[in-house]
Swiss-Prot record:
It comes from the Bacteria. One of its GO terms (biological process) is defense response to virus. BREX systems (bacteriophage exclusion) provide immunity against bacteriophage. Part of a type 1 BREX system. This system allows phage adsorption but prevents phage DNA replication, without degradation of the phage DNA. Methylation of bacterial DNA by PglX probably guides self/non-self discrimination. When the brxA-brxB-brxC-pglX and pglZ-brxL operons are transformed into a susceptible B.subtilis strain (BEST7003) they confer resistance to bacteriophages SPbeta, SP16, Zeta, phi3T and SP02 and partial protection to phages SP01 and SP82G (these include lytic and temperate phage). Keywords: Antiviral defense. This is BREX protein BrxB. The gene is brxB. It comes from Bacillus cereus (strain H3081.97).
């Protein structure tokens, strides 16, 4: 298994390659990628994302558009006036109630999923979408759910999910312990 620094150093050359930005896989599959990593490297991965954004900020041909799913969720709840209500309601009715209420408020399993809409409204043609905050937003937003819903909506630009856990081309295992539903449409961004 290769070291995390070696894998991180391969991301920038990969995402700036023209074939990556054409956004098609082997059989013209949509360009969804997962960069999985040991959760203990979370801060290192976050720092490297900032580094890549800095390196590309003067390149007009492409732009990294990062969506921290946790921050997106908070912003949507705040805009809808639900954030403080959720905090108050959690104290009265408990975490399980709020978990379900928040999922419903975000419409996570419907055709008008608010997180997906938030992302699609902001994606531009020269973007490479980075999804972060996967661990922070669990269990409210599940990895496979957001990927499945985005698959229908973001098909014109490459998307990379930074995943604190393991992905073997079929199973997403958050934190190396929590098995999510299977997801088989994404490619491994950088081999381990």
């Amino acid at each position: 298994m290769r070291r995390i620094n070696e894998r991180l150093d391969e991301i920038l050359p990969k995402i700036t390659d023209a074939s990556f930005r054409e956004n098609k896989g082997l059989g013209n599959e949509i360009g969804f990628y997962i960069f999985d990593y040991d959760p203990k490297y979370e801060m290192l991965v976050r720092e490297h994302i900032v580094y890549m954004q800095e390196r590309l900020k003067n390149d007009s041909s492409l732009h990294i558009r990062e969506f921290d799913l946790y921050e997106v969720m908070l912003e949507i709840l705040e805009e809808k006036g639900y954030l403080q209500k959720n905090i108050d309601m959690e104290q009265k009715k408990g975490s399980d109630f709020i978990l379900n209420a928040t999922r419903k408020a975000l419409r996570l399993t419907s055709n008008n999923d608010l997180v997906v809409q938030y992302i699609t409204d902001r994606v531009q043609p020269n973007d490479i979408v980075f999804l972060t905050g996967v661990g922070k937003v669990f269990p409210i937003i599940r990895s496979h759910t957001i990927l499945n819903n985005l698959h229908k909506a973001v098909d014109n630009v490459p998307l990379v999910m930074f995943f604190p856990g393991t992905y073997d081309g079929l199973e997403l295992v958050l934190f190396g312990e929590i098995k999510d539903d299977n997801y088989y449409r994404a490619f491994q961004l950088i081999d381990k």
